[in-house]
Design a protein with these regions (language model features):
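N-terminal capping/small domains of soluble enzymes
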Residues: 1-104, 339-342, 346-348, 352
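A mid-to-C-terminal "edge-of-domain" accessory segment
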Residues: 2-37, 266, 270-436, 472-475
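Short, ordered loop/turn segments at secondary-structure junctions
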Residues: 73-74, 101-102, 122-125, 163-165, ...
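Mixed-charge, glycine-accented linear interaction segment located at domain edges/termini
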Residues: 488-493, 497-526, 530
């Protein structure tokens, strides 16, 4: 029997049956991506992006390789028009598009923004025509033709959408599509506006339209039934050559098709190329999350925190042997890193690997004791982070590195219209070192001063702050993860609890530095030890 899975060298590990099923299907070699994070994505409830935010996201999308960026809806407001104009004037390689209703006034607003193209929409389903627009099908057709012709007469690339297209009769869709094609429409989009298609139906629906039009087709799918990505891919099988999507699946109601899932689905399942640099996906996802204030769910496909995280002992053992055992792709392909989480389901391999990451090696019996403590801790409902695991490890072996670095003095100054400045004196193996640095805030200044006193080779890889109690005098917990520029394998953790965020951060840094210092000395030769830092 032919195996269902072969280990490829592409870094993507999917079933061979996909290729067998779709080998006879005619599909495009490449698909364009229209990203509408700045328009449909911004319509996510409680999201409002400034012009500066839109430019930042547009630049990131451009660098990632997005073909078309739908920058906004200029007629909506002066601020929106300003944002679209600023994106259009940013010198990006991507085609910059503006959304317009089938109205000359909307198109004029887009023209004032100097965009490359417009995406014109007009609802065509019976419910929209009768209940919302209160116009006939003939009037809708004529409005569509007039809008497309107006855009073309003004030198714009025009993409047209029959809003609520998947609930519009195919006969009427064909009438509208034929009419706008005759006046020069460049692309036709098929929107599943309220996410009501199944993938099989979407493929056939797009294929029917494909038979009646000559211009390129796009699809635009919403996630009301959780089918947006599947329907987007299904539309490509039916003949679409462009997909509308948003970063992290942002959008109205349940959201839109997620760009990262669409792109990886096209590549992994159908070997269809896009211009997207997939290694930038995780960065762009984080940027969009930060600027919109919408957190990415931990179990989100491709870019979620847990997408390449493993806790189960069986899974960890498998992944340590070969990543393809429990991962469908290499994490670095999408800009992620594999992580092992220690918890209730962990086995020796996971705990051993995590402790080894921070330079702590234990005997088999000691490791079993650590695992037993970890499981007991987890079963009581507590989450064990890396710093706490490290503390358990040191407790089991009965040693903790003697601190070579001691904080002797620390001062920080900050205030309104005053550049935050920090000064530290660190005693390192009996020698006092003083350093002063500025920063964007008191914590940044303090971290910079500590690094200057010890070594510029220190890298603050992670900083995590959590409030333990409530109120203005709440206790806080700071955890830092430090690395070394000269040796990527050297990592350490520091953790501290206190009522002052700045001093607690400094204490965590000093603890982390002591552990990093000890690890550095362990791998240095005798000659190098005195100049380790």
């Amino acid at each position: 029997m032919e195996p269902a899975f072969k280990i490829p060298d592409t870094g993507v590990f999917v079933s061979e049956y996909n290729k067998k099923i779709f080998s006879a299907t005619r599909m495009p070699e490449t698909v364009k991506i229209l990203d509408t994070t700045l328009r449909d994505g911004e319509q996510t409830p409680n999201v409002a992006l400034s012009s500066e935010d839109k430019v930042k996201i547009a630049q990131a999308l451009d660098e990632m390789g997005v073909d078309i960026i739908e920058a906004g809806f200029p007629i909506n407001s002066e601020g929106e028009a300003d944002a679209v104009k600023r994106v259009a004037g940013s010198g990006l390689k991507s085609e910059i598009c503006a959304l317009c209703r089938a109205s000359p006034a909307d198109i004029d607003a887009a023209l004032r923004c100097d965009v490359d193209s417009i995406h014109v929409f007009l609802a065509t389903s019976k419910v929209h025509l009768e209940k919302k627009l209160k116009i006939s099908q003939d009037e809708a057709r004529d409005k569509a033709v007039t809008a497309v012709q107006y855009g073309k007469d003004h030198g714009l690339t025009v993409e047209f959408s029959c809003e609520d297209g998947t609930r519009t009769g195919l006969d009427f869709l064909n009438v509208v599509h034929k009419a706008i094609e005759e006046v020069g429409v460049d692309r036709i989009d098929i929107p599943d506006t309220v996410g009501v298609m199944t993938p099989t139906a979407m493929t056939q629906f797009v294929a029917e339209i494909r038979r009646n039009v000559k211009v390129p087709l796009a699809d635009h799918c919403h996630d009301d039934f959780g089918m947006s990505v599947a329907n987007s891919l299904a539309g490509v099988l039916g003949g679409a050559e462009e997909v509308h999507c948003t970063v992290n699946g942002l959008g109205e109601r349940a959201g839109n098709a997620a760009l990262e899932e669409v792109v990886m689905g096209l590549q992994a399942f159908y070997n269809i190329k896009t211009n997207i640099n997939t290694r930038k996906m995780a960065f762009v996802s984080r940027l969009v999350s930060q600027l919109t204030g919408i957190a990415v769910q931990p179990n989100k496909a491709i870019v979620g925190e847990n997408a390449f995280s493993h806790e189960s002992g069986i899974h960890v053992h498998g992944v340590l042997s070969d990543g393809s055992t429990y991962e469908p792709m290499r994490p670095e392909i999408v800009g992620k890193e594999r992580t092992f989480v220690v918890g209730k389901h962990s086995g020796v391999h996971a705990v051993q690997n995590k402790l080894k990451e921070y330079g702590l090696e234990l005997s088999h019996d000691q490791m079993k004791e650590v695992v037993a403590r970890v499981k007991k801790w987890a079963e009581s409902g507590k989450k064990l982070d890396d710093a706490e695991l490290l503390a358990v490890g040191y407790d089991v072996i009965g040693q903790e590195e003697a601190p070579a670095i001691k904080l002797e003095e620390f001062t920080v100054f900050t205030g309104l219209n005053f550049t935050p400045t920090a000064t530290v004196v660190l005693n390192i193996d009996g020698e006092n070192r003083r350093a002063s640095e500025t920063g964007v805030g008191p914590i940044d200044a303090s971290v910079s001063a500590i690094k200057a006193a010890v070594s510029k080779n220190i890298v603050l890889k992670e900083y995590r702050l959590e409030a333990i109690t409530g109120g203005s005098n709440a206790l806080c917990e700071v955890t830092v993860k430090l690395g070394d520029c000269e040796d990527a394998q050297l990592l350490s953790l520091g953790k501290s609890v206190g009522s002052d965020i700045v001093t607690t951060s400094v204490d965590a840094m000093v603890e982390g530095l002591n552990r990093l210092w000890a690890r550095k000395l362990d791998v240095c030769s005798e000659k190098e030890k005195k100049r380790a830092y």
